[in-house]
Amino acid sequence: MVVGKIIKISGPVVVAEGMKGSQMFEVVKVGNEGLTGEIIQLTEDEAIIQVYEETAGIKPGEGVTGTGAPLSVELGPGMLKAMYDGIQRPLNEIENATDSIYIPRGVSVPSISRVIKWDFEPTAAVGDEVITGDVIGTVQETASIVHKIMIPFGVSGKIKEIKSGSFTVEETVAVVETADGEKEIQMMQKWPVRKPRPSKGKQAPVIPLITGQRVEDTFFGLAKGGASAIPGPFGSGKTVTQHQLAKWSDVDVVVYIGCGERGNEMTEVIEEFPHLDDIKTGNKLMDRTVLIANTSNMPVAAREASVYTGITIAEYFRDQGLGVLLTADSTSRWAEAMREISGRLEEMPGEEGYPAYLSSKLAQFYERAGRVECLGSENKQGFVCIVGAVSPPGGDFSEPVTSNTLRIVKVFWALDANLARRRHFPAINWLTSYSLYIDDIAGWWQQNTAADWRSLRDEAMSLLQKEAELQEIVQLVGPDALPDRERVILEIARMLREDFLQQDAYHEVDSYCSPIKQYHMLKIIMTFYKKGLDAVAKGADPAGISAVTVKGDIARMKYLVEEEFVNTKVPEIINKMESELGALIK
């Protein structure tokens, strides 16, 4: 064990001497209070340490003790429904242990309870040959999730002993006879946060992640295993969009990282999620959620740790064959923490003061997303989707964090303050957003909705772009000066915006829209477009088309329950549309 001495303190950065024998990224205990820190630079016998707790009050001459291990997370039953800080300290347990609403410095509480006993059901038997990643038993962790206990990395052999019953995470549930001797298997394992968990290989992103948000699913779809960025200025709805994704996404587990954002936003999640039901299982949303709260008033160094802690937990659930959504709100705050620490280290600054390695750090994080074939002899597949919010100052998408993020991710949901001011939510700008997964996921949509899904989607997108071009003319000469065909295009684009893209996150029905309902809504609007053009070509007045009463039915379809809408209302609206538009033809 290496014991050094503090020689310099600069905010969250501490320099210690006498650290020869230490390793990069080793966790150390700093000062008399034993603050948790991590070595980020080694020079001869000096170590530069970033401290994950407030450094006020420590002074040169105090000791620094190495632990001999990198920053790691504990993985096992008990993580779901938990709320951690950036270095996986359980906030509820800290409050119970210290009777304080603040985190005392140097406090050390196990990340996973060592007291709770879990009912372990073995799925393997004595004599079975097992390899890394094989499931040997299960634990019903919450009503929604069956936690699979896996053989840890680097262990393979024959099961000599396996137990059944109630155990804590530290008790031995199985013994495996390996080439190096007997290995005891517990329900908990540790993993260094900076090291991606291995898999057999990545798979093509061909299945869409259904979020229930029409603009995201139909126009700018994210594939399972994909990465997406949500940049937007203040007040444009980043957090509500991420809450919607966490509530409704077609995943098994959600890891929500509040990275440097307001504490109130985490409070909203804690208050809301326990009362919301998961549409897949009917159980509470909190049963499938892990929260990592690293709010803006917590030490900046822990922001980086919170992002890596979150992705490691997500990869662990992925290795069980589950689908995981990781939302990070906001990666800009992590980048600002990097900038602050880089400045303390007196490194050469890059663009806008951010460190030169900003893009490689972002890439290391986003590249840990993916749909993979999991380790083990069974055919397990899991995925991690990453959705990172970006908060560009003043909504400037050319700033370094946004521009570097866009080089890495394949889906860009651009939030627009002007749309938010016009009360258009979700405020995703359909002209600047894009998805590079559309070609990959179109096959799934055509198979699960209808063969004309892609053509409808592309035609609707081109109408919205055409509307943007026509708006410049309309502002100069007014809509009445346009040809009849283009007046119909303006009306249909308005219907697409207001009746399809707009979605009420707080409405009981409209908060979530299934793929089938999305398809039929789009189909009705595009059918109205085609029939409207036919009517105009045969002499109908565009003003009359704008005044038909069926438009009211189209506007209300988003609030109808799916079964009623698809089975009864769709044919009714189509029939009414044909009769009303037919009556306009002279």
From Swiss-Prot:
Catalytic activity: ATP + H2O + 4 H(+)(in) = ADP + phosphate + 5 H(+)(out)
One of the Pfam families matching this protein, by short name: ATP-synt_ab_N
Signal peptide: none
Localisation: Cell membrane
GO BP terms in the entry: proton motive force-driven plasma membrane ATP synthesis
Gene Ontology annotations for the cellular component aspect, listed alphabetically: plasma membrane; proton-transporting two-sector ATPase complex, catalytic domain
Gene, per the UniProt record: atpA
Chief location: membrane
Alphabetized CDD domains for the sequence: ATP-synt_V_A-type_alpha_C, ATP-synt_V_A-type_alpha_N, V_A-ATPase_A
Residues annotated as binding ATP: G232, P233, F234, G235, S236, G237, K238, T239
EC primary class: translocase
Record family assignment: Belongs to the ATPase alpha/beta chains family.
E.C. code: 7.1.2.2
Name listed for the protein in its UniProt record: A-type ATP synthase subunit A
Membrane topology qualifier: Peripheral membrane protein
Membrane-spanning residues: none
Quaternary structure, from the entry: Has multiple subunits with at least A(3), B(3), C, D, E, F, H, I and proteolipid K(x).
Gene Ontology molecular function, alphabetical: ATP binding; proton-transporting ATP synthase activity, rotational mechanism; proton-transporting ATPase activity, rotational mechanism
Function noted in UniProt: Component of the A-type ATP synthase that produces ATP from ADP in the presence of a proton gradient across the membrane. The A chain is the catalytic subunit.
Keywords linked to the UniProt accession: ATP synthesis, ATP-binding, Cell membrane, Hydrogen ion transport, Ion transport, Membrane, Nucleotide-binding, Translocase, Transport
Entry superkingdom: Archaea
